Every structure is written in structure tokens, then in C-alpha cells.
């Protein structure tokens, strides 16, 4: 049998946030190291995190950026745009202001050479439709990130599906974030907080409560999410927690989603990019909370050949492991699974 068409691997520089925030490495260093350590070929950046003054670009920046990407042997996969409607301190941006805010970022993405722009849920179906002519003119694809606590079942995402079906444009799509499809709380988070003297009884209570939420299924309203936050805060107080320990409870609600992996099939025709979110790799080379085998097989079965950006978010609590090595471990895991898929298909 001829070779299967497989997704391509890459990385988002967001995975290396601790190094960047600590100024251990510059933006330019991270591009170079991603190439040197074979963490590409796909390269994704978050505009506002990576470039001072974004979306304005300094003189000569584009030429220098493209040269560095080429020298690193990388390919531009996606640029993360922000859709922060709460920029003013006393109000939210209105739709005209948010349209202008997003349009500027689309122009910058084009100038930098990115084919795909990640957008966030503040961008409504109406706003996506308003931005579509510009995206088509610039030959850009806008991908709405589906990030925990949202899921393919959330009304905001369902409304976008309806609008996509109406508009029928290849310049509109979705970006699944695997953090929406966990099977358990990340063990590395529990271990880190235990080492920080968070009471074991509290961590066990969080773990059990997350399992209860998981059995109940995805949330579809802000009220449901608020109730889950309150429940975790109640546990924190009951078991003698503090401002540190409450973080894992809030993360359990906001970051670690309950969507069934197979449910991504509902939006698979519109998948234009993937955030390969992960939190840790165990001694067996597996990610214990994110079901990589199921997720990758689903992409292969759907014929998806775009990029998967490795996105290590364990840095929120894990300050000891090397982010570069963590991404390398995930790439090894994904390549191993691709090999298993090819073997099952009889590929030689």
C-alpha cells in the first residue's frame, strides 16, 4: 500500500513561554532552537506575545523574520491573533472597534507570511462574516479556536457552524485544542501541587470532583461554568486550601475540558489547524491525560494533512522540565502513533 497522507508536526512558541518571560531566550533564539532541535517544521506564534508593538511591525522586521525562519528550516503554520474585547477598562469594544482590531492583525499576519490566523470566541459569527472579505482578499484562513471550556456542542460553536455552512468559504475554519478533550486531570499538576504542600485530601477531592464533572459532560452555558468554579472554591475552603491551591481547582474548570475525542468529527470538515495541547509525558512515553491515539487516528481517518502545533501548557505549574525536551517527547509519541497507524494500514 502507498504511504498514508499524515498530519504534519510543528510547534507553537507559546510552549516556551517560561523562557521568554524570564528573558532567558529571545524571540529570535526560540525560532533558531526550534529548528536546531527538530521541533518543526511548522512554526506558530502568538502575535502579541512574540512581537513588541504588535500588530505594528518595526522597520525591517518582516525581512529579518522570514530570513530567520528559512535559516531554521521551518515553515509558517499559523499566527495567534487576540480577540480581547475587554481592552478598555470601563467597557467592551463594540463590533466596529473589534472588527478594526482584528483587521489590523489579519494584515500583519499576511505581511509576515502566515496562511492561517487563530481567532478567539469573542469573534461572533457576524464579525467573522464582516472579516471574511478581507480574509479572502489577503488569501488568509481564519480558524476559530475551540478551547476548553468550550466544545463542539457549545452554542457559540454551533452558531459558527451554521454560519460557515451558509457562507461556504474555504477561508473559514476551526482549530481544535486538545485541552478540550481530556480523560483525567493531568497527573503532573497533582504531583506538583502535592510537592508544594497542598493537602492531599484537597487534591483527591479536586480529582474526584473533576471526574464527576466529566461524567456530567460538557458545559454549554456561563452559568454552568460558574457553578463549577464555585464548587471548586468550596472544596478549597473545606480542606484548608489557600490562594495557591485554588489554582488547580480553577484550572480544572477552565482549562481541562470534557468533550469526547470522537466528537471532533462534527467539525472535522472545517479543521484548518490543530493545537496539540499536552501537559506531561510519563515514564512510558505516553501523555496520561490527553488521548493522543484516538485524536491522531481521527485526524488521519478524516484525511487531515495540515499542521499539529505541539502546545505544552504544563509550564503553568511545572517549572523543572525543559520545555524544548517536552515538545520533543510529544513529537516522538506522535511519530510512534503514526507508525502504528501505517502498520495497521499495511503501509511499507
Swiss-Prot record:
Active site positions: 147 (proton acceptor)
Cofactor: Mg(2+)
Binding site for Mg(2+): 145, 177, 275, 311
Keyword tags: Carbohydrate metabolism, Lyase, Magnesium, Metal-binding
Gene3D superfamilies linked to this entry: Divalent-metal-dependent TIM barrel enzymes
Record GO terms (molecular function): lyase activity; metal ion binding
Annotated effect of mutating residue 275 to A: Loss of activity
Temperature and activity: Optimum temperature is around 40 degrees Celsius.
Catalytic activity: 3'-dehydrocarminate + H(+) = kermesate + 1,5-anhydro-D-erythro-hex-1-en-3-ulose
InterPro entries (UniProt xref): Xyl_isomerase-like_sf
Effect caused by changing residue 147 to A: Almost loss of activity
Effect of residue 313 to A: Almost loss of activity
Enzyme class: lyase
E.C. number: 4.1.99.28
pH influence on activity: Optimum pH is 7.5.
Function: Carbon-carbon bond-cleaving enzyme which participates in a carminate degradation pathway. Cleaves the C-C bond in 3'-dehydrocarminate to form kermesate. Also shows weak activity with other C-glycosides, such as 3''-dehydropuerarin (3''-oxo-puerarin), 3''-dehydroisoorientin (3''-oxo-homoorientin) and 3'-dehydromangiferin (3'-oxo-mangiferin).
Subunit structure: Heterodimer composed of an alpha subunit (CarB) and a beta subunit (CarC).
Name the record gives this protein: 3'-dehydrocarminate deglycosidase alpha subunit
Organism: Microbacterium sp
